[in-house]
Amino acid sequence: MSSSNFNEMNELNMTQTNYGSTKYTAQHHQGVINAIISSLTAPDQPTTVSLQYSNDKNMATEIQAYAKLSGPNWTYYVKDLEVSIGRNTDPLNSALQENSDGVKNSYRVNIDLGPAKVVSRKHAIIKYNMNIGGWELHILGRNGAKVNFQRTHNGPNNPPIRLSSGTLLDIGGTQMMFILPDSDPVVAPICIEHLMPNLINMFGLEGNNNPLLRDIIKQSNYAKQRQLTSNQQIKGFKLYGSGGNAPFGSGANLGPSEQGIFNNNNNSKNKNGYFTSINPNYTASTTTSNTINPQAASPQGPPNTIIAANFVDSYKSSNAYPQALDFTSDLSHDENRNVKPPHSYATMITQAILSSPEGVISLADIYKYISSNYAYYRFAKSGWQNSIRHNLSLNKAFEKVPRRPNEPGKGMKWRISESYQQEFLNKWNTGKVGKIRRGSSVARQLQLHMAKFNSLPMEMDYRLSLNMAQPPKRQLQSHNVLEPSNNNIIEGFVQHVPSKGNLPASQQSQPPVSHQNQSQQPPPQEQRQEIQFTFADTQNRNIALARPIKTPQLQAPNSNANLNQNNMKEYKESLHPPAISISQMNRQSPNNALVSFTNACANSKIINNISDSADKSTNNNGGTKMNLPAISTSSLDENGNLEPTTTTSSGNSNSVPQTGTTTSSLAANSLRLSQPYDTLLRSPTKAFHITAMEAYTPERGSANRARSPLHSNSNNTNNNGANNSNLQTSGMENKQTGLVLDSNVLKSMESNNDNRRLTPSTSKSQNVKSSPGVWNLLQFSSTNNTPAADSGGNKRGFSINPDIKAKENENATSEKDSDSNSNDLETKDINSSPLKNQGGSTANAKELILDTDGAKISIINN
């Protein structure tokens, strides 16, 4: 509920309010509270709580409880910090069920509002909030509830509703008041206005000789309106003539009442611009009709009728219009099945609702009313019924109400909203209802109904007739409840609600509890004994009333904040060590393509050793991290021979994978090419040798070949961007495919000594992938996918330049200790497929010949 409603509750302070010069005692306030509780409504069928906690059974004068919920004839004392409200499905005297441990389980709610099924099994919970020091209402049922006659939101996701002493609750048609022992109940003025018809019907305008109740009734808007009705000061707007079916006819067609309105010399125009007509021959009557039967309405108009002056002029002068039809009667005949009524759906819905004496009607009855009064909809298709449902749901003037308990049928009923009705009555009483703008069809129908009957069926509550069914018992109960000797109701009616959760000043000034003390709080059962209070006799003033202790909610001190920050800083530093420059690792690389390639393969072990730190290091140039694919390269063993080394990607998209890099990526900082040497970038067209282990590369055919660490290099100042991109992509292709150049080609390159680097790939191969079936054949050539072992020094029988082998030995010996995988392969003789087992003599060894241009593989004997 919004905060404005709570502010409105604080406006009515009966303890400090004097009506006239009369002083009110505590007994007067208690009598008003008892009168309000006795005027609360209840379902037709007695609820279980009214039978279980009837006031006849509460004979004790002193009961220890935290709070109480009072209904019209029952009282429930809250003795726990949490109370459930709902409907029990098992009988009241049924035995409790026992679980496997022998402990009795009770799924019963504390306050049973059954047997009406409009109440959910677990509809609401009232619990005490230790943090704020107050009681809260949690609504769980699908049909919701009303707090101080204002509908609230339901569901576990909605915030709870703060309760104060004097709050009125309406759950499933059962109204009750929440009362605290240490504060006088505060009843909102809007609640008194809603209950005023019941109060007047039960206690009359004199308020059962209670001066406070009498003054409250006299100051209410409902009593003032009823007094005007008793004096027959009826305000009406004659929109349609009641005689001759001629509202726009001449004066000869007017009835006696209408002629008296326009021809009477007693007509006068008041200050609001309305004509007032007084018929002296009219005999006052104190009875009013509560039905909307057109035949029951008298053809004679009311004696006092106030209509707009401009409407009178148009009424008298417009005699040229044809006679209007009485649509409510004529269009019901079958011969008018093709005549569509000139009414909106909201108008017909309002007519159907007003046709009920209680102002409440079901959806089926709305259909029945429209089809009975309008032949067009009786013979039309059922599409108009969907429009009726949409208007009921979307129009704020209509609201749903539950059925009575055990009432036949299903579904909710409909009525005109109470707020809309109250707004209309306020305009009606102030004379502003004539300013109805276009489209307000509901207000126009209410205006017509008030003009004929001077009352609305919604002015009575939906269940008021049920309460009035037993007037002697209710009257006797009201007299008994107003006696000062009643000990079940606490004294006082209105006390101003404190702004801080209804807490006394002593509790509001409490110092905050420390964190250590808060952690050592007693269990709720012990605290429950400390904060209990006593509902005592009004004569006994010496009994102390305690209130639940407010426990402030403290936040845990952030004493470990600096320590946590230091730990996090050290953890981040461990994850991000200083980056190692690639150019420093490759500082001694000579300017030769193959030597750079083999050195890069050897240096892959260095990179792999520092991969735990380098994979999370940031780029010094741009500060950004690059996503690089996993690369499989060949490294050198201690003898300088090529040995395959396979690495995989770490899977982290923000880190550098643990790979060995090739020539193009390591030596690209000082690499510059020009257009005339583009032909040297192409690989030889002759077939080159590839072994089984070289072919077994899981990354072969990867789509990430165009990605390279060279993308973040800012030192390359070559203006020819095409050559740079060509170099990067070709170098990456070399990485992925693991191509090995022929030794004869490399020797011819060294003899020329033209200081040009060669990347063994072609521009044609950059965009053309080899057949996937070829690589699958090579990858799965071995059953266990294990590398072949050699007993000799040269494990693969490659013809490598001695100078190159010497330079490779220098780099390979520095990583001898860290290369455990190479040592394992040297000491093991793995018997796998014939393609991998190439040890011993190479005379009978078979090699694979791969032609990249023709995508062919052939096996030859050495």
Curated annotation (Swiss-Prot):
Region: Disordered; residue ranges are 498-528, 611-663, 698-730, 750-846
Kindly state one GO CC term assigned in the UniProt record. cytosol
Q: Phosphoserine: which positions carry it? A: S708, S832, S833
Which UniProt keywords are listed?
A: Cytoplasm, DNA-binding, Nucleus, Phosphoprotein, Transcription, Transcription regulation
Q: Which GO terms describe its molecular function?
A: chromatin binding; DNA replication origin binding; DNA-binding transcription factor activity, RNA polymerase II-specific; RNA polymerase II cis-regulatory region sequence-specific DNA binding; RNA polymerase II-specific DNA-binding transcription factor binding; sequence-specific DNA binding; transcription coactivator activity; transcription coregulator activity
Q: What does this protein do?
A: Transcription factor that regulates the expression of the CLB2 cluster of genes during the G2/M phase of the mitotic cell cycle. The CLB2 cluster of genes includes mitotic regulators such as CLB1, CLB2, CDC5 and CDC20 as well as SWI5 and ACE2, transcription factors required for the subsequent temporal wave of cell cycle regulated gene expression in the M/G1 phase interval. Involved in HMRa silencing.
Outline the subunit composition. Answer: Interacts with MCM1. Interacts with NDD1. Interacts with the origin recognition complex (ORC) composed of ORC1 to ORC6.
Q: What else is known?
A: Present with 656 molecules/cell in log phase SD medium.
- Know the name of this protein? Fork head protein homolog 2
Provide the species name: Saccharomyces cerevisiae (strain ATCC 204508 / S288c)
The beginning of the lineage is:
Eukaryota, Fungi, Dikarya, Ascomycota, Saccharomycotina
Gene name as annotated: FKH2
